[in-house]
Design a protein with these regions (language model features):
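Residue-level recognition of beta-strand microenvironments
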Residues: 40-42, 86, 103
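Acidic, low-complexity mobile loops and tails
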Residues: 20-79, 116-151
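Short, charge-rich, low-complexity interaction segments located
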Residues: 100-116
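Periplasm/extracytoplasmic soluble domains of Gram-negative envelope assemblies
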Residues: 85-88, 96, 128
Length: 151
């Protein structure tokens, strides 16, 4: 009897605005993505910024998140903190310019929440200084293609 190979589960699948990259990392439609693997979720003139599922998978078990302070101001491409895992440390690069209006304090005691749900556990919320900067970021499809080239 000839065996037919089974494709990997969910490879390239799309459901309810969520797609899965070849690395099995989740990518969400409607968000903006940077080449340094941060995402931006915009709500009016404010935005949530965190690391992508691809980033948390690459880092492994996250043990510490160095977050900015409320009222800190960042330009796009400025470092705003760092994420440390058992495998590596990675600088966080702000994909947008703005003023920090909130940080996710839960990550101080439970940095591993990012491993459980990277998109649900943002790092900082900013008041955007220049929404036109979003045009230089990737949409979900472009980010998937970017991750596929990196992998």
């Amino acid at each position: 009897m000839k065996r037919i190979p089974t494709p990997p589960p969910l490879a390239g699948a799309r459901a309810a605005g969520v797609s899965i990259t070849k690395t099995m990392a989740k990518v969400i439609e409607g968000l903006y993505y940077s080449e340094s693997h941060e995402y931006v979720k915009v709500e009016g003139d404010e935005a949530y910024v965190g690391i992508t599922d691809y980033a948390q998978e690459s880092l492994g078990n996250i043990v510490y998140v160095d977050m900015p302070e409320v009222d800190d101001e960042f330009a796009a491409e400025d470092d705003f903190g760092a994420v440390e895992s058992v495998k590596a440390a990675s600088d966080l690069v702000s994909p947008v310019s703005g003023t920090v209006i909130e940080v996710n304090e839960a990550l101080e005691d439970q940095p591993e929440l990012i491993n459980q749900d990277a998109f649900g556990n943002w790092i900082m919320k900013v008041k955007l200084s220049d929404k036109s900067e979003l045009d230089s970021l990737m949409d979900a499809k472009a980010y998937e293609e970017f991750c596929a080239k990196e992998h």
